[in-house]
């Protein structure tokens, strides 16, 4: 919505332009009228829409044509004033003033025009018979108001309609020649309907209609009013009401009716509540609400976010099989202007039979987006209507910004639930297979798969009895680590091929260059263990290297057969406890402490639960 409104009054000499302005401001007909009034600014607090309004007069005696063109260029709306008793001033509306205002402008970019018939006190009848042909000829004419500056009749209405033409314009919504909603408006209202009907049955129930009404207008509809609305739709459409609910066609018809009856502010209120601007595009303020993220912090979905996303999943899982089919996923993304997830999704998260997306994989993908690009995540939540459906100011309500990592290290504990692991190693080590194994795919299954590759894989692991999300990122040796800023992560997995004698050198070099002086926990993983281990050409063995640098001993891994998930838990645990020395992570006493901590937490929780039950 515009922040202010600039109204320009045009018309032939002596039609009463200046008198109208002075009558509005002084609330009386002026005894003496200057040839032109100074620009008037009406403050926001005295206008119905709470928007400051500037009213500009025009005088052909005082102003040149160049000055007139400048004023037209600055105006948001033009009031063409005519004398209801003078047919020549009416004729000049179409032959002179409207062509001067809009000239050769494109239909969608023309200035809105209000026709103002002044001096109605001097005429018994109405000028509308002469005006209607002009209104039919020029679609940019919003309305016509007959008034009297002398009797103060309809003066405030003139400027109200002018303001309304700017703040709630008809042109973006409705094509008066075709007598139907414009495509962009229909598209926006279809998205709004899809968001508002929350069980995906293509019908707005009474409950959903009331929630929609409350959200947009601040109060629910009375039961009789609901029935009256449906009755109007039913009488005028063949399929607007079904199973006592409003269909999409019924919803579109209602908005068309509002506009045709001059109540387009109703449709604009709906559109703006759902984030649309005057061009019917979602605003940046709606899609990208401000979120402060300190340098060492990360971003995660909180339980509000997961709860909302699970509900959205269940809405589109029509067959209730716990997984979204391609058509169900397409339905899910119907409120997006584009499909945000590509074919690599199948290699990023766990999928069900036939490539369907189960709830677990779906939540993992959202977790990945929230961690890597929170602003994109906020955008996606905005498309789904999070602020409206959750009755929140913005979708930042669904996001937790974690404590800075330096504070976690200082306090010796972290509250994070999502960790990033960089998987680093020379080409051909088996990094991609390691990522796919995290999703439960054996090497044989990977070789038979035609899924497109992904540099990420996301899954959950247990750390001390608690479920955490672990994101694996495969570092491209050709493009990554060009600078130190490429290295940060929660844990580094340095992977070498035990069957290649030159493989360990790369990992040792990366460790010394980027991680030896850092506080990032590191684990060395010897891959392809099933192919036999050879001596590494490094001077000292991988085990000796790890011992020398106080790291846990190398973990041997193979993708043959059923993947072993132990290493993934070790990586997540190292990320969750970065304050501990790396060698402590490999000791039995550490793992016992983690297990005992989880057990104690469970016992305390159960004891509190029983105490609460007794108190009830």
UniProtKB/Swiss-Prot annotation:
Segments on the Cytoplasmic side according to the record's topology features: 1-590
S-S bridge residues: none
Gene: rhot2
Sequence positions that bind GTP 2: 428, 430-433, 528, 530, 559
PROSITE patterns: EF_HAND_1 (PS00018), EF_HAND_2 (PS50222), MIRO (PS51423)
Known role: Atypical mitochondrial nucleoside-triphosphatase (NTPase) involved in mitochondrial trafficking. Probably involved in control of anterograde transport of mitochondria and their subcellular distribution. Can hydrolyze GTP, ATP and UTP.
The keyword Zinc-finger belongs to this UniProt entry's keyword annotation: no
Entry-linked CDD domains: Miro1, Miro2
Gene Ontology CC annotations of this record: mitochondrial outer membrane
Protein name: Mitochondrial Rho GTPase 2
Compartments (UniProt record): Mitochondrion outer membrane
Keyword ATP-binding carried by entry: no
GO molecular function list: calcium ion binding; GTP binding; GTPase activity
Mitochondrial intermembrane topological intervals: 614-616
Keyword terms of this UniProt record: Calcium, GTP-binding, Hydrolase, Magnesium, Membrane, Metal-binding, Mitochondrion, Mitochondrion outer membrane, Nucleotide-binding, Repeat, Transmembrane, Transmembrane helix
One GO BP: mitochondrion transport along microtubule
E.C. code: 3.6.5.-
Catalytic class of the enzyme: hydrolase
Binding site for Mg(2+) 2: 432, 474
Main location per the UniProt record: mitochondrion
Gene3D superfamilies the UniProt entry points to: EF-hand, P-loop containing nucleotide triphosphate hydrolases
Membrane topology recorded in Swiss-Prot or TrEMBL: Single-pass type IV membrane protein
Binding site for Mg(2+) 1: 18, 57
The Miro domain, residue ranges: 2-168, 416-577
